[in-house]
Regions:
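Bacterial N-terminal signal peptides that target proteins for export
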Residues: 1-8
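A short, polar/proline- and glycine-enriched secondary-structure boundary/capping micro-motif
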Residues: 103-106, 180-186, 239, 268-274
Length: 327
């Protein structure tokens, strides 16, 4: 018998229907798909042993987080905190000015910024560190210092942490002449009796241009390299001793501002503080390729929504001349 190909068509259709449904009722079987798990956010600071304690301090903008340190840093028992802010969203501000005392809590009462730390150095109610606000000089880094105030005079540029017009941050050294012209130097200037910095010395000098800046020193990390410039900056702040410290840094890769404080002077049993080298190493480990030290010792303080993180080593908050706020 001659076979016609169309003779098999009904059988093939029936077989196909049966293969789609074991009962042959014409319903297509629905397969269950696994719902992919949402990606887990990796917190680089938690991975390094820090603890996210933001919720302990109340409501906070989503672009600011607060962390407490692991029990040990640099092989020392420590109590430290960092506030980390998205630099593309947060506002960096300098509080205070050339003179006048304020505790950090008084700054908070006036400003209510989520994060406040102490700022630069001061003496007798006057700032010794640069304050630069809205693109203008408020007060300079101290222009001259001396070990004897008679025969030896050091005109030393000191460290500055600055926000630039493009929104990035950088550390460097500044010096202001008697005409209030401020110069920016990429390297520090070696101490030399009577030698003044100017528009061409040290090398790479240029007019200082920034939106906002706070002075302090010494510079701890620049260009992702740890810097030892406290001698060139003539900062006699016990750099190799364990003390309370305050610093501010910038991670240019992730666009993060990192504000650091550590407790010291035995306010908590067994907690002496950290050296400048310790702080530099910690900040670099946290990803900061630019970091400047600020005033430390009894001045060191960080407020989160007005609440203290470390215990000030004076027993209570020291009155300071300026501070830094993140909003």
């Amino acid at each position: 018998m001659k076979i016609n190909k169309y003779m098999f068509l009904p059988a093939l259709i029936a077989l196909g229907m049966a293969s789609c449904n074991g009962e042959g009722d014409g319903n297509v079987q629905m397969w269950e798909w696994e719902t992919p798990e949402a990606p887990v956010e990796v917190d680089p600071y938690v991975e390094k042993g820090w603890t996210n304690v933001t919720k302990d301090y109340g409501e906070m903008p989503e672009y600011i987080r607060v962390y407490s340190s692991p029990a040990k840093l640099q092989d020392k028992d420590v109590k430290a905190f960092i506030a980390v802010a998205d630099a593309t969203k947060a506002k960096f501000d300098v509080l205070g000015g050339a003179e006048g005392y304020h505790t950090p809590s008084e700054f908070y009462t006036a400003d209510a910024a989520p994060i406040i730390i102490n700022g630069g150095f001061f003496y007798d109610g006057s700032s010794l560190s640069l304050v630069w606000r809205n693109g203008e000089l408020v007060c300079p880094n101290v222009q001259v210092d001396s070990p004897d105030w008679s025969e030896t005079w050091y005109y030393m540029p000191r460290g500055v942490f600055a926000k630039k017009a493009d929104g990035s941050f950088e550390v460097g050294w500044t010096w202001t002449d008697l005409q209030d012209h401020t110069y920016w130097y990429p390297p520090p200037m070696p101490l030399e009796n009577g030698r003044k910095p100017d528009a061409s010395y040290p090398a790479g000098a240029k007019d200082f241009q920034a939106v906002t800046a706070i002075g302090g020193g010494p510079v701890l990390v620049k260009g992702n390299e740890i810097i030892n410039s406290y001698e060139d900056e003539y900062l006699l702040i016990n750099p190799t001793g364990n003390r309370p410290r305050t610093a501010i840094g910038y991670n240019s890769t992730d666009h993060k501002l990192v504000l650091f404080v550590c407790e010291g002077d035995g306010m908590t049993s067994g907690i002496a503080g950290m050296t400048l080298e310790d702080v530099a190493n910690v900040m670099k480990d946290l990803g900061c390729d630019e970091t400047c030290n600020l005033d430390g010792g009894g001045s060191s303080c960080m407020l989160v929504n007005g609440k203290e993180t470390i215990k000030p080593s004076d027993g209570s908050q020291r009155s300071v001349v300026n501070g830094v706020a993140i909003k």
